[in-house]
């Protein structure tokens, strides 16, 4: 379905470029900073992205995304034959650094006034390449009476490497361009599993169940500057 949309958007963009717009100089390079919130997971992200536009309606992008939970004080309680344990700051098991290459297509721009402001709708397809696959952590014993002994040792979590090497994402956005500046509002559809590298994590022989959603969608805003 996405590739049908790309074909239609490409054809429309190519046919609808009027002569005046085709004659306008294309600013080939743009630096973007995007930030957003997870629509399914309780996360936020920040991404720095470089953009190259060989022609007015087609471009390629490379970004580095930093992902983090919105709350840091959450803990995961684990009950196993060895007893009760608590995994503090289990966000250490999630993906934090993600490489994000993509391509984008733009619909013909809509002139908003006589000073050059434009509204551009854009569709982007990319892959998400998590960089931190090897995660480790510790679980702490939680006695029934709530009192820990004076001396105790945390238990290491065994984590067998897992996770998909990459994930897919498609985003749609509206971009307001004024001279060299660009303001973006968009939504991303993704199959990202933020705990993908910890699906084979164990405490002893007990499998640890991290939160799992069907999708990893995000809503985002961004600002860009054309060089």
Write out the residue ranges for each language-model feature.
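Short glycine/proline- and aromatic-enriched beta-strand/turn motifs that initiate or cap beta-hairpins
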Residues: 16-67, 72-75, 106-108, 224-226
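Flexible, solvent-exposed coil segments and beta strand-coil junctions
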Residues: 23-31, 76-85, 145-155, 200-204
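Residues that define the transmembrane beta-barrel architecture of outer-membrane proteins
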Residues: 27-31, 42-46, 56, 91-99, ...
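Membrane-embedded beta-strand positions of outer-membrane beta-barrel proteins
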Residues: 31-37, 60-64, 101, 121-127, ...
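Extracellular loop and loop/strand-boundary signature of outer-membrane beta-barrel proteins
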Residues: 32-36, 47, 82-92, 154-160, ...
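Gram-negative (and chloroplast) outer-membrane scaffold detector with strong preference
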Residues: 49-147
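Predominantly the C-terminal beta-signal and adjacent terminal strand-loop region
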Residues: 168-227
């Amino acid at each position: 379905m996405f590739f049908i949309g790309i074909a239609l958007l490409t054809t429309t963009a190519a046919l609808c470029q009027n002569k005046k717009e085709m004659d306008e100089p294309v600013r080939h390079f743009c630096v973007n900073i995007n930030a957003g919130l997870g629509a399914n997971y309780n996360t936020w992200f920040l991404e720095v992205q470089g953009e190259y536009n060989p022609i007015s309606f087609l471009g390629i992008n490379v970004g580095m995304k930093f992902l983090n939970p919105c709350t840091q004080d959450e803990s995961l309680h684990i009950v196993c034959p060895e007893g009760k344990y608590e995994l503090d700051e289990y966000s250490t098991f999630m993906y934090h650094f993600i490489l994000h290459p993509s391509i984008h297509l733009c619909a013909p721009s809509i002139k908003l006034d006589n000073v050059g402001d434009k509204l551009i709708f854009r569709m982007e397809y990319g892959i998400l390449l998590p960089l931190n696959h090897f995660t480790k952590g510790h679980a702490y014993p939680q006695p029934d009476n709530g009192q820990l002994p004076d001396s105790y040792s945390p238990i290491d979590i065994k984590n067998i490497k897992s996770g998909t090497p990459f994930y897919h994402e498609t985003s749609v956005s509206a971009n307001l361009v004024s001279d060299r500046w660009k303001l973006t509002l968009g939504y991303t559809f993704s199959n990202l599993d933020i705990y993908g590298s910890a699906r084979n994590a164990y405490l002893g022989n007990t499998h640890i169940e991290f939160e799992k959603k069907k999708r990893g969608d995000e809503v985002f805003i961004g600002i860009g500057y054309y060089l």
